[in-house]
Amino acid sequence: IDTNLRSKRLQKTKEIDDYTYARRLYLTTIGRIPTQKELLEFIDDRDSNKKDKLIQKLLNSSGYVNHQLNWWTDMLRVKDRVNGTNINVGAVYRKWLRDSLYSKKPYDQIVRELVGSSGKLLDGGEAISYYLRDRGMQEDNLSHTIRIFLGTRLECAMCHNHPFDKWTQKQFYEMTAFTSGIGNVRLRDQ
C-alpha cells in the first residue's frame, strides 16, 4: 500500500482513533452506534487483535442479521400483501430471508433460490415470494431482477430501445418470456 501511495504521490490518511473506529464499525455492520458499555469495553481492551475480535463479534450477532435483513427487504421490495390474497406473504418472505441469513447461506445460493424458486408458498417454497411480489407484472419483475442482480437499468427498454446501452426492446421482451410462464394457482387463506 505504501509503495502504491508513493508512486501516486498520495499521502496516507491518519489512522482513526478507537472511538471513531468502533462507531463506524457498529453503524456499518449492525446499523446502530455502540452503547457506552460496548464502546468502553472496546476502548479498554489491550489485545492487539481487538479490531478483528470486534468485527467477528458483530458479524456473528443478531444485530448484523437484522441489519442485513432490512437491506435485503428494501432491495427486494418485500411487501406484506399480494393482490388477491389475505396471506401475509411478506412475513413468510422475511422469515425465509432471516433464516437464510442466520444460516449464513451464501449470496449466490440466495439469488439462485430466489430467481429459480418454485413450489408452494406455505409448503417449503417461501422463495417463490420473489415472484409473487410482482404477480401479473413480469416486466416489472424482470427489470427489477436485472437491476438488482446485474446492475443494469432496463426499465426504458419496456417502451423503446435503451438510449445509452445496447439493450433493445425486443431483447427485453425476449428475456421477459423466460418468466412469463411462471404462474400461480389461486392463493387462498390458510
Locations of regions flagged by a protein language model:
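Short, structured secondary-structure elements
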Residues: D2-Q190
